[in-house]
Amino acid sequence: MPLAWAAPLDPQELKDYSNDWAAELTATSDTLVTSTFRLPSDAIAAGLEIDSQSATATGGVVFFDVNVADQDSTDWDDPTGTIFRIPHQITTTGGRRLEVSIFLTVMQK
């Protein structure tokens, strides 16, 4: 089941979002090795970018922004925003590869 980040991203912002896998890792007595967020093609076409990303002890943190050329696009003016499905994959020391999709809304605030 996809998750959703509660706070939308304004196209003018550089903003961090995180996802935590602590419950899954604890249940399997495993530890995180890598964390990777990926952008789908529709997000890339709209100008969404990953500025940086990093792994934490139990998940990942990603910073999103919109490239300067697309920040003033009228696509962001929809009052409900534009929603993108962002995959987040981790690998563990136990050899597991886990993935979840998280919805990110981009809209003018």
Give a label for each model feature.
Residues T31-S35:
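Solvent-exposed loop segments of extracellular immunoglobulin-like
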Residues S41-V61:
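Low-complexity "stalk/linker" and mucin-like segments enriched in Ser/Thr/Pro/Ala/Gly
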Residues M1-D30, V106-K109:
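Predominantly extracytoplasmic/ectodomain segments of secreted and cell-surface proteins
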Residues T80-T93:
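A short beta-strand micro-motif common to beta-rich folds, especially ectodomain repeats
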Residues A69-T82:
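Surface-exposed, short loops/turns at beta-strand junctions within beta-sandwich domains
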Residues T56-D72:
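Aromatic sugar-binding surface patches on proteins
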Residues R96-M107:
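C-terminal edge beta-strand
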